[in-house]
């Protein structure tokens, strides 16, 4: 009887080992999801074109007003449309989202790292002047974190971040010497922004017009802001400048070389991109027409569909926009565009 029991136990153990070897159960960590590779049909159905144009939107102030409370059209607070109501800004963001635009970081665009889902288009949001209504702080909470006015630009963006998680909300803020004009909070604001998915760039120390100054002044205007950023958020800002007034207006201007390669206080500051003021969408970073050192922006304002306002520009973009294939490491373009493609180490698909 004992022999029978021992034999049965041995058979049970061997059986368990045999089944375990041939019916191995993988834990969730061991299961690798395979991503479906897009086919030519997907590119055709979504009109994929990664040599299309990308809108870089230029904002300044966002004012806590309704559109009906201004003297100007479509939410403009001033006659030139550099200042917008918070109602207009919310409407702008809804428009971008509903028209299949998804935000990306400006620095990622410059570096050709456009990570947008299949069939969607990248859009870049920028703010100049470091105005208080870009990120108005109303106090400090019990955890020591800043409390942001929900009607300031960042307050609105944070609401949209929660409302539309796939919007990939981000923006780049270009500051002058006043930073965000809230001395008691400026350092906390800078750190909060870079820790919460936003970028900080250079808008010169005194909002200088580069057309009217010499090389020494040009270098100082650029260098002072980089020095300030090095002090407050070392290694966490972007070496991109938004040119005040769009000056010096021409890439061939003598001061451009000092803007892009400034020496100040014994330190060299290299700037990889300079942003202009107007007026249209910019080329794909994979296009031969792309010059990362002198980029166009779209003034975010309303002018009844004229003078390159938001409405006019986005109508033009209906035929020319960058449409993603959903793979950051692959460039997909129509055959008709292949002659515009730069030499690249990325995988390229032509359909």
How would you label these PLM feature ranges?
Residues 1-4:
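Positively charged n-region of N-terminal signal peptides that target proteins for export
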Residues 13-15:
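C-terminal motif of bacterial Sec signal peptides marking the signal peptidase cleavage site
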Residues 17-19:
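Bacterial signal peptide processing site
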Residues 26-126, 136-137, 212-351:
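C-terminal active-site subregion of NodB/CE4 polysaccharide deacetylases
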Residues 57-62, 126-130, 176, 203-205:
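Short loop/turn segments at strand-loop or loop-helix junctions that form parts
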Residues 136-162, 171-173:
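A short alpha/beta connector and helix-capping loop motif
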Residues 145-156, 180-199, 205-233, 253-260:
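Alpha-helical scaffold elements lining the catalytic groove of polysaccharide deacetylases
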Residues 157-168, 182-202, 266, 284-293:
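Acidic (Asp/Glu)-rich catalytic clusters
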């Amino acid at each position: 009887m004992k022999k029978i029991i021992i034999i049965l136990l041995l058979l049970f153990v061997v059986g368990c080992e045999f089944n375990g070897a041939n019916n191995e159960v993988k834990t969730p960590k061991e299961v690798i999801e395979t991503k479906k590779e897009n086919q030519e049909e997907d590119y055709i159905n979504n009109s994929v074109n990664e040599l299309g144009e990308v809108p870089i939107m230029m904002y300044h102030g966002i004012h806590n007003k309704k559109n009906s409370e201004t003297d100007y059209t479509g939410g403009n607070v001033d006659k030139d449309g550099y200042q917008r109501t918070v109602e207009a800004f919310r409407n702008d963001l809804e428009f971008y989202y509903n028209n299949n635009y998804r935000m990306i970081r400006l620095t990622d665009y410059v570096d050709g790292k456009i990570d947008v889902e299949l069939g969607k288009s990248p859009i870049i949001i920028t703010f100049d002047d470091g105005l208080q209504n870009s990120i108005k702080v109303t106090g400090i909470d019990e955890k020591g974190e800043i409390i942001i006015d929900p009607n300031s630009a960042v307050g609105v963006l944070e609401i949209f971040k929660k409302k539309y998680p796939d919007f990939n909300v981000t923006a780049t803020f270009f500051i002058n010497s006043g930073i965000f004009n809230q001395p008691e909070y400026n350092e906390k604001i800078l750190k909060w922004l870079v820790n919460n998915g936003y970028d900080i760039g250079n808008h010169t120390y005194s909002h200088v017009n580069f057309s009217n100054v010499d090389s020494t002044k040009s270098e100082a205007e650029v260098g002072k802001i980089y020095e300030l950023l090095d002090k407050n958020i070392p290694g966490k800002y972007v070496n991109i400048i938004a040119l005040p007034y769009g000056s010096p207006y021409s890439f061939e201007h003598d001061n451009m070389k000092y803007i892009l390669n400034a020496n100040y206080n014994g330190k060299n500051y290299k700037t990889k991109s300079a942003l202009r003021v107007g007026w249209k969408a910019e080329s794909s970073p994979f296009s031969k027409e792309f010059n990362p050192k002198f980029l166009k922006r779209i003034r975010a304002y309303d002018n009844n569909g004229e003078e390159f306002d938001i409405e006019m520009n986005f109508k033009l973009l209906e035929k020319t926009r960058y449409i993603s294939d959903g793979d950051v490491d692959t460039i997909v373009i129509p055959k008709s565009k292949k002659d515009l493609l730069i030499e690249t180490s990325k995988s390229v698909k032509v359909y």
